[in-house]
Amino acid sequence: MAGTNGGGAFLLVYIFFTIAIGLPVMLAEFSLGRRSQQNALGTFRVLAPGTKWFLFGLLSIIAAALILSFYGTVSGWTLEYVWLSISNSFQGQSAEDSIFTNFISHPYKALLWHIGFMFLTGAIIMGGVQKGIERYSKLMMPLLFIIIIALSINSMTLSGSAEGLRFLFFPKLSELTADSILSALGQAFFSLSVGMGILLTYASYIPKNDNLTGISLKVIITDTLVAILAGIAILPAVFSFHIDPQAGPGLVFLTLPKVFQGLPAGEIWAILFFILLTFAALTSAISLLEVPVAYLVEEKKLKRPWATVIATLVITCIGSFNTLSFGPLRHVQIFGMSLFDACDYLCSNILLPLGGILICIFAGWYLDKSILYSEISNNGSLKTRFFRLAPICIFLILLNVLGII
């Protein structure tokens, strides 16, 4: 995202949104979820009985499912590239070679990886939060952090890496546009998992004596640190090998194999990097799938295995259309966008900011403030004006992008 939206300027706006808007929205979601001890829909059914607020909970569940439908597509690509790295299939290939294009446009190969990734996610989440999610997260996240630090150190030793670091850390505010600002907001929401029901659902598992402010700050600091390390790991290497930083998804799947060929022990670095991507994708997918699964278990009273199977199958089917939009369904367009791009745009630019606005309005204006103060375990030092300010900021950004102001 930083490569396609101005580098350091995008990073600066992203960090600002993460702290100024992401923190209060996250605190609001944590507070509501822990207070209700319910899923995304049940939270509003319990805290706002007899109202239409439950529809926002339903919207959050739909948003999580749609995000996972296209996220599973990209995650399937990472599995393919793990295999290509292990089999050393990149050897002798140039950045212009069409391994990636041939793969995603193949009639069924990308689809099989998408299905495989989704069923792997379902198998993990079937065990529940503690047996499934927590166990694998404790293994994957420290390993992810170690790998990305190693890649960052290696990347900074490359010739010409200073240019990449300059691109990342010296912002050019003139390159910011309304669209890139909205992208930074959407990326902040996506990386923090706010506005899509994940935090509402996970907060129902948080013990009552845990400090929500401390948890939120730890999440934001860790997320921001990982984002910066990822930029250090990728962008200096990209500039070192004279690759266009605005390549977007192609930056990873089209050009980085070429980058790894020029590194000492490049095969090992390639394997580590794409395993890193797979781990990151899997942890996010697990969180997204838990939202509809928790809804089916708590609202529809299904057993967790059946709820997981149903949610996984439905999302996999939707995601299959997104996956095939690069191949057999590439001519199908919605408002001039492919199925994949349309789904991405709907979620990132509309549903997530809208979710952030609604959660802040509910917490800052509708809900009894005593509930927030009793849940936020910092002796009431967080004032509700943060919740009143956040939706206004988000709303103004949306109006600006739409050309209304």
Language-model regions: role of each:
Residues 2-5, 40-59, 72-130, 162-182, ...:
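Inter-helical loop and helix-membrane interface segments of multi-pass membrane transporters/permeases
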Residues 3-28, 109-110, 348, 352-355:
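Extracellular loop-to-transmembrane helix junctions
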Residues 9-13, 51-65, 112-117, 176-185, ...:
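Select transmembrane alpha-helical segments in multipass membrane proteins
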Residues 13-48, 237, 241-244, 361-365:
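Juxtamembrane transmembrane-helix boundary signature
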Residues 42, 75-105, 206-209, 214, ...:
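Helix-loop-helix connectors at the membrane interface of multi-pass transporters/channels
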Residues 56-59, 302-312, 344-394:
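C-terminal membrane-solvent junction of multi-pass transporters and transport-like membrane proteins
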Residues 110-112, 222-228, 267-270, 279-282, ...:
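Loop-to-transmembrane helix boundary motifs in multi-pass membrane proteins
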Residues 134, 138-282, 306-307:
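Membrane-embedded translocation segments of transport machinery
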